[in-house]
Amino acid sequence: MDQAKLARMQASVRIGNPPSGPRANRNRGKGTPRRKVKKVHKSSGADDKKLQATLKKMNVQPIPAVEEVNMFKEDGNVIHFGNPRVHASVPSNTFALYGNGEEKELTELVPGILNQLGPDSLASLRKLAESYQNMQKNQAGAEGKKDDEEDDIPDLVEGQDFESKVE
């Protein structure tokens, strides 16, 4: 598009407050309506309200007295929610957790959560602990190999004789 034509089109559109200064009387014709400046205010509160409205349509009910929620990840870490607000809709199999989640290591939570686990969870926790120990061993073995490589003294190899070149 031609730059001059583009500049004329931009000048013909008035946005916001009327201009002041030497170009104040320019573009004052009736054919150029004033356009409002679009101000977008997006807040997380609006998202929460939409979520609450959707959950209300699903007929969720609050579940009281939930002290903590732990979500186990595949890498061995745990997402821990302390005193979350929990809402549930059993017919639609939907649960909503509200609160600040913290990512913690499994070893930080083990003593406190053992009495809360059932037999299925204990078996999965054992597998998770074994895989965690294997990861620890693999990391320690890799670090040990690096240390061994650094400490090795290179072997002497018969090569060129530089003393004869100095003379």
From Swiss-Prot:
One of its GO terms (biological process) is protein transport. Disulfide bonds: none annotated. SMART domains: NAC. Its main location: cytoplasm. Pfam families: NAC. One of its GO terms (cellular component) is nucleus. Residues 25-42 have a biased composition (Basic residues). Residues 148-161 have a biased composition (Acidic residues). CDD domains: NAC_BTF3. It is found in: Cytoplasm; Nucleus. Residues 45-110 form the NAC-A/B domain. Residues 1-48, 133-167 are annotated as: Disordered. The keyword Transcription regulation applies. Keywords: Cytoplasm, Nucleus, Protein transport, Repressor, Transcription, Transcription regulation, Transport. InterPro entries: BTF3, NAC_A/B_dom_sf, Nas_poly-pep-assoc_cplx_dom. Component of the nascent polypeptide-associated complex (NAC), a dynamic component of the ribosomal exit tunnel, protecting the emerging polypeptides from interaction with other cytoplasmic proteins to ensure appropriate nascent protein targeting. The NAC complex also promotes mitochondrial protein import by enhancing productive ribosome interactions with the outer mitochondrial membrane and blocks the inappropriate interaction of ribosomes translating non-secretory nascent polypeptides with translocation sites in the membrane of the endoplasmic reticulum. Part of the nascent polypeptide-associated complex (NAC), consisting of egd2 and egd1. NAC associates with ribosomes via egd1. Belongs to the NAC-beta family. This is Nascent polypeptide-associated complex subunit beta.
